[in-house]
Amino acid sequence: MSKQLGQKIAPTPISNDINVVDLIDQYFTAYNSARLREICQLLSRDVLTEGVTVGVSLSGAMTPAGFGVSALAPLIRNGFIDWMISTGANLYHDMHYGLGFELFAGNPFLDDVKLRQEGTIRIYDIIFGYDVLLETDAFIRKILQGEAFQKRMGTAEFHYLLGKYVREVEKQLGVQHSCLLATAYEYGVPIYTSSPGDSSIGMNVAALALEGSQLVLDPSIDVNETAAIAYNARESGGKSAAVILGGGSPKNFLLQTQPQLHEVLGLEERGHDYFVQFTDARPDTGGLSGATPSEAVSWGKIDPEELPNTIVCYTDSTIALPLVTAYVLNKCQPRPLKRIYDKREAILDKLQKDYLAAKTQPSDQVPAAVAESAQKQTATYPCGRLIPNT
């Protein structure tokens, strides 16, 4: 008998009064259902504890389906999401709900030529009026003309201000369940966009630039702030978790915080402590969306000692997210809010000081093992530290 046996599969009939926790724990026994169960259990047991900083990346058309309101916002309110990377499209379509616009369930087999003639937009099996886009655009352009937006800023500050205005509209409309942007604003959760020009929000920013707007979204601010968040998670004695919904650019932007710290800044080399992903992308095509945790170890994105705490579930995020949300909301106590948005400047200042200190570090403070081989090595990190021979 193999020594690698796990828990015995002992199926019993599903009852008519089962709750979501028991359903997942007892009946998600194999294949990707088992990976989903393992993720739920890892989150509830280890990740959603007070000492872990949880970053979430969001790609795919999740918010048009309502998951910003139904799943992500409740996770934020319970302290289970500390910071996020999202596509701009997800944040744009999330605003429709906050502004009181209507989206409808359709089907993927409608006549798209006829829909275009009728002024109807389709996102697979979601449909809504073209006027929803126009009115959302008009709202964005109106508030972006305000004085608060007339400067260079990162996308966290930009989305914080957007969320502030959306929240005011929600209050006026009597919206009971806030959208993702408004909730993140209220709970101090910074949301970054890895490619701010790649969405209708970015398109409206670009249009206003033609009119003389001084708003500039600076990606360097985002790269440094997100690296500072990952750095602070460790410097404060805690751990860092990456929860990835889909893949794409948001996934990389979340994971690249670690190479930014060790490869570029030369400050540390560990990687994130926890990595869970829901994806339908294959690893054998070489794309980032399907890249495995073990591959990420080779880049220094994941701590190799924490590989047992990395799980990939190959499934649709629209199936996994509501199940995982229901599981942890029923299983876990709310965590104290970190309100990382309010601490951005302080943690970035700490990162900058440590980087500059390392860059100008006197030779007598260089570790002995490195100093002894200094003459044999020429390659250095940008901060000036020697890169060890491999």
Swiss-Prot record:
One of its GO terms (molecular function) is deoxyhypusine synthase activity. Its EC number is 2.5.-.-. Disulfide bonds: none annotated. The keyword Magnesium does not apply. It holds the Pfam family DS. InterPro entries: Deoxyhypusine_synthase, Deoxyhypusine_synthase-like, Deoxyhypusine_synthase_sf, DHS-like_NAD/FAD-binding_dom. GO terms for cellular component: cytoplasm. Belongs to the deoxyhypusine synthase family. This is Deoxyhypusine synthase-like protein.
